[in-house]
């Protein structure tokens, strides 16, 4: 039996995952599953963003990639954002209800804010609602779903030729790894990600390539000793 195509108001094919109530009440298929820390590279993330359309749908998914990658949000935290939670002048995003009901403020770089602009400009033309909302049809302005985000990420990753898993949480891992590479202290990374303990943050950093560790340690200088120590090296 052929399932009829689902079209949006412009006649374009629409993923069933974007329909209101899709998989309502069902747990995600990957609930409870653990994936290795294998974050995408900068080149892979940029390639996926470039394959998003140059319209409101594309600007929305590009903006979602940005807040997950450059601010390290969980996908549900991003989907719960309102426009007034954004503080571009301070470079901050307010997460009102993070994991465990915890509230926190996170930072985002200037480049990330610039990348949000096309979607922010388009969003004001839609009904009042969450920052990331449905664009077409009778539910315009209603919340976008996590299932729809994951579906869109998979589709764009295939088009971009990215072979590794490209999912919202992988972008969060990429954020943590990049901060560590840039020398940001572990306790600040922990606060940025909203982790209750450093052990969880350390797991995220397992995505650092062993070759990077070897190179960094191999490049260390010889130990420095004061003359008064009386020790020969």
Task: Identify the function of each model-found stretch.
Residues 1-233:
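Conserved catalytic core of the tyrosine transesterase superfamily
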């Amino acid at each position: 039996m052929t399932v009829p195509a689902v079209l949006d108001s412009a006649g374009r094919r629409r993923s069933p995952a974007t329909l209101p109530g899709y998989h309502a009440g069902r747990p995600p298929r990957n609930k409870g599953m653990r994936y290795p820390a294998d974050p995408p590279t900068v080149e892979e993330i940029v390639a996926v963003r470039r394959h998003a359309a140059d319209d409101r749908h594309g600007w929305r998914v590009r903006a979602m990639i940005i807040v997950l990658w450059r601010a390290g949000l969980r996908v549900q935290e991003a989907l719960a954002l309102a426009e007034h939670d954004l503080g571009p002048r301070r470079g901050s995003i307010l997460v009102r209800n993070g994991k465990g009901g915890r509230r926190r403020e996170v930072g985002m770089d200037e480049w990330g804010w610039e990348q949000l602009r096309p979607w922010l400009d388009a969003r004001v033309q839609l009904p009042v609602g969450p920052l990331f909302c449905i664009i077409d049809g009778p539910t315009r302005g209603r919340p976008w779903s996590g299932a729809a985000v994951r579906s869109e990420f998979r589709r764009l990753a295939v088009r971009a030729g990215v072979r590794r898993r490209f999912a919202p949480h992988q972008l969060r891992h990429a954020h943590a790894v990049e901060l560590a590479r840039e020398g940001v202290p572990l306790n600040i990374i922990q606060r940025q990600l909203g982790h209750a303990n450093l052990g969880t943050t350390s797991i995220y950093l397992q995505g650092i390539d062993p070759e990077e560790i070897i190179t960094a340690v191999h490049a260390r200088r010889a130990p420095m000793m004061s003359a008064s120590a009386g020790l020969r090296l």
